[in-house]
């Protein structure tokens, strides 16, 4: 959980990482190499990592829960980018993660 919040901060607040993420989002359509990097860093790579973590934590339906967990994280990158009140979005993101984790514990 703490790691996911740190990754969100990294991909949204770090100047280099945020610019890199935005560049990959655009360039994925122009180059197979950029598409592969986009998938590796922002889509299938993180989703697979979360799934593996959930398997090791013996969370039920690790693949389904990983998709639910990471999809929310991924969408919040874009919400954050377009928000006037970025602190509010970050808080909403953290609350959403807490809620998902609580639901998975049940």
Give the role of each language-model region.
Residues 11-19, 25, 29-59:
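Amphipathic alpha-helical packing segments from all-alpha helical-bundle domains
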Residues 1-18, 62-69:
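Hydrophobic alpha-helical connector segments
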Residues 2, 24-36, 76-77, 87-94:
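Short, charge-rich amphipathic segments
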Residues 10, 14, 27, 31, ...:
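Phosphate/oxyanion-binding loops and surfaces in catalytic or ligand/nucleic-acid-binding neighborhoods
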Residues 40, 44, 53-104:
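Hydrophobic/aromatic-rich alpha-helical bundle segments in the mid-to-C-terminal region
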Residues 4-6, 18-19, 31, 44-46, ...:
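Generic serine detector
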């Amino acid at each position: 959980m703490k790691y996911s919040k740190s990754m969100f901060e990294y991909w949204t607040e770090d100047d280099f990482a945020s610019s890199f993420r935005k560049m990959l989002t655009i360039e994925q359509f122009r180059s197979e190499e950029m598409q592969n990097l986009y998938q590796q860093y922002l889509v299938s790579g993180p989703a697979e990592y979360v799934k593996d973590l959930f398997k090791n934590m013996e969370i039920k339906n690790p693949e389904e829960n990983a998709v639910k967990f990471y999809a929310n994280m991924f969408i919040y990158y874009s919400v954050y980018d377009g928000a006037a009140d970025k602190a509010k979005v970050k808080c909403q993101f953290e609350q959403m993660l807490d809620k998902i984790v609580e639901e998975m514990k049940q």
